[in-house]
Each structure stands twice: as C-alpha cells, then as structure tokens.
Amino acid sequence: LNHLYLAAQLVVLPGALIFLWHRSKPMYERLRNTILATWVLSIPIYAAFPVAPPRLAHSGLVDTITTQTGLSLDSSLTTSFYNELAAVPSLHVGFAVVIGMAVAAAVRNPVFRFAWLLWGPVIGLAVVATGNHYVFDIAAGVVAAGLGYLLGAAVARMTPRSPVREPALARA
C-alpha cells in the first residue's frame, strides 16, 4: 500500500494524462481541467486550515512509508516538496477517483474499465492504512474533486475555441 500511495501522484497521474492525450483529447482536457481546478480550490483550504495527518498526531500510528520504504516524509528534502499539514482534502483520493473515472471512460475492455473504477477506493484504503489520512479527509477529497470537475467544466465552456485550420492545398 505504501508504494500505491507514493505512485498515485508521481506515476499514475502523469501516466493517465499521457494515456488520455493519445487516446481521447476531450477526456484528457476534462481530467487536466479537473486536476487544475481542484488544486485551485484546495490550496486556500490548506493555507487556512492546516491539518496534520494521523501519523503526526502521536496517536500510536506508525509512519509505514518511512518504516517500510526507507523514505522519510519528515526529512527537510522531502518536506520541501510537499506540505505535511495538507491532509484535508485528500487530493490523493480525489485525484485517484477522477483519474479512475476518466481512464475507465477511455478504455474499451470491461475488465480494465472496472479495474480503473476501483483505483479511487484502493487509494482511499492505502492513505488510511499508511496513516496519512483520516476517512473524513477522503470524503473531503472526493468533494473537492467533484467541485473541481464542475469548475473545470465551467471554465472550459467559457473559453473560446479557435477554429481548426485546414492545411492549404498546394497550387501547381
């Protein structure tokens, strides 16, 4: 579960965007807009209401990522790349849900489609089991991603599209 937690943002998110760029440009644009809008909505929440994850609450939970992978989430190098007090909303889960839905909509195989729909719940399990989020954080992440989807869709509707130019025919 530790590796899933780490891979969710570092590997799967960019991989899904690249896959959708090649498979379905409209789905790529929807996912990209949702991710960006969700970030825009969530950053002020992180700044206004810093919330520690369970592993920092001194409640007896062990930081399984540090103990099982050797990566310390508390090191000065690691904390320079992420805010350890940004537990609510859980964007790991919010993003995993929208990634799963977007990729599921783009794949044809029903088994892969079903598997991608499970991506969000699997990441939800991983973030709780690794002591990085409470269940409330998961719900807040899903709500944030839903609002991000709505905001991203609204911005896309308001953005004028430039017409696609046909290549000029060569004249002899």
Mark where each language-model region is:
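Membrane-interface loops
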Residues: H22-V111, A156-A172
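Interfacial helix-loop-helix junctions of multi-pass membrane proteins
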Residues: P53-G60, N83-A87, V122-G148
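Active-site His/Glu-centered metal-binding helix of metallohydrolases
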Residues: V11, G94, V135, A139
